[in-house]
Every structure is written in structure tokens, then in C-alpha cells.
Regions:
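C-terminal, charged and often intrinsically disordered regions of DNA end-processing helicases
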Residues: 1-73
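Glycine- and acidic
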Residues: 24, 43-52, 79-83, 147-157
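Generic recognition of stable, solvent-exposed alpha-helical segments in well-folded globular domains
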Residues: 26, 37, 54-66, 90-93, ...
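Residues immediately flanking
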Residues: 38, 45, 65, 117-119, ...
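A non-catalytic, helix-rich entry segment at domain boundaries
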Residues: 46-124, 197
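Non-catalytic protein-protein interaction segments used by genome-maintenance enzymes to assemble
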Residues: 119-176, 198-199
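Metal-dependent nuclease catalytic regions and adjoining charged, substrate-binding loops involved
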Residues: 171-216
Length: 216
């Protein structure tokens, strides 16, 4: 039947994915790609294609560096000068609205506890690289905020996949700081839309480990 054929194709794709050596070190933002479509991700690793830098990626790099500088971070991301020097006026003009949106956000007048804090979390044989854009104190704990210069989640499924990144960040900061997970909130700020997205629920440590083990 057609269903049997589709199931066979899926099993074949998963079998092929298992033959591809996947990286041991994984950016937290890629967790969702493993979970949502491992065969497609494995194919990209099997046949890597050179990618041109996208305007959105460049804008994201510039915006994150600007926020770092605004909060007085001593360490600015490497490579920002080279991006600016290629076409500084055009690059700066393209993020003016992002800056304006940030200045009107609730984050603008807060002092972060952490800015661009990198923490590594190990699950099984893999290490996830978690770079927390900012951490702010709350009344009874902290809130992790991830600045996004791209588009908001298009639906509930998309949001739940993106939220895996926040769940990893929360776990990472819990291990780093010693704070229990329930004292750590996490949210996205989609700067271009001036929109905050805070998932109602984030996976806990055991759930993340189980999900990863099921995926790999």
C-alpha cells in the first residue's frame, strides 16, 4: 500500500542518516533540526554545500554586537569590524529599526547579569554549545532572553521546536549557576517585529535527555 511504501521510505532515510557521522559538538539552535528532520540534516552533513552570507545573518551579527557594546560588554564578537568595513553605512542603516525597537523594549533599561555567556551542556556523547544572549534578574530568579532578528514562529509547532533552544539554555544556566530550573525563565525577543515570545512550558532535563536519545 501507499502507507507501507511511505513507511519503508522513512525507514530507509533514517537508516541512511545513521550512517552519516554527525558532529559531537552541536549549537543549541540546531537541536530542533535534529529532532524535526534528522535525515535531511544528515544529508546536509553528507553533502555540505557552500552558503553565501545572508543579509539576515549579517544583520543578526551586527545587532548582537551592538547590544553587547550598549551594555558595556568587554568582549565583542570577532569579525564585526570586517563586516562593517565591507559596507559600513549600508550595514548600519539596515539595523536602525532593530536598534529603535530594542530601545523601546522592556530590556532597554535593565542591567543584565550576563551578556553573551557561553555554556556547554553534555547529553550522552554530544556537547551542546549554548550562547546566552542575556540573563536578567527577576523577583525570584532569572530570565534568559534570546534576541532574534528573524521571523516569529509561524505556528504552535514551529514555536515548540524553537523552544527547544530555550530549554537547553535553561538547563545550561541551571548547571552553571546552581539555580533550580523552576527559578529560570526563558523567552525570545523578535526584534524586527518588536514581539516577545515566552513559551508556556519548557522541557526539563530528563525530557531533553529522553528526546535526544530517541532522536539519535
Amino acid at each position: 500500500t501507499d502507507i507501507d511504501l511511505l513507511l519503508a521510505e522513512r525507514d530507509e532515510a533514517l537508516a541512511q542518516a545513521n550512517l552519516v557521522p554527525l558532529p559531537v559538538r552541536v549549537p543549541a539552535s540546531k537541536f530542533k533540526d535534529f529532532v524535526s528532520d534528522l535525515p535531511a540534516l544528515a544529508e546536509r552533513y553528507r553533502r555540505p554545500m557552500p552558503q553565501k552570507p545572508y543579509k539576515q545573518t549579517r544583520n543578526g551579527t551586527l545587532f548582537h554586537a551592538w547590544v553587547e557594546a550598549r551594555f558595556g560588554a568587554a568582549h565583542l564578537t570577532d569579525g564585526i569590524d570586517s563586516v562593517d568595513n565591507q559596507n559600513e553605512s549600508l550595514a548600519q542603516e539596515s539595523i536602525q529599526q532593530l536598534k529603535a525597537n530594542f530601545e523601546s523594549s522592556r530590556w532597554a533599561n535593565l542591567e543584565p547579569l550576563e551578556i553573551e555567556r557561553e555554556i556547554q551542556v553534555t547529553i550522552g556523547a554530544n556537547t551542546f554549545i549554548c550562547k546566552l544572549d542575556a540573563v536578567f534578574a527577576t523577583a525570584d530568579g532569572v530570565e534568559i532572553v534570546d534576541w532574534k532578528t528573524g521571523k516569529k514562529p509561524k505556528d504552535a509547532e514551529d514555536e515548540s521546536l524553537k523552544a527547544l533552544q530555550l530549554a537547553l539554555y535553561r538547563l545550561a544556566y541551571s548547571r552553571f549557576s546552581g539555580l533550580p530550573l523552576e527559578k529560570i525563565e526563558a523567552s525570545f525577543y523578535f526584534v524586527a517585529d518588536d514581539s516577545e515570545v515566552k513559551p508556556e512550558r519548557l522541557l526539563g532535563e530528563a525530557e531533553l535527555i529522553a528526546l535526544w536519545n530517541e532522536t539519535i
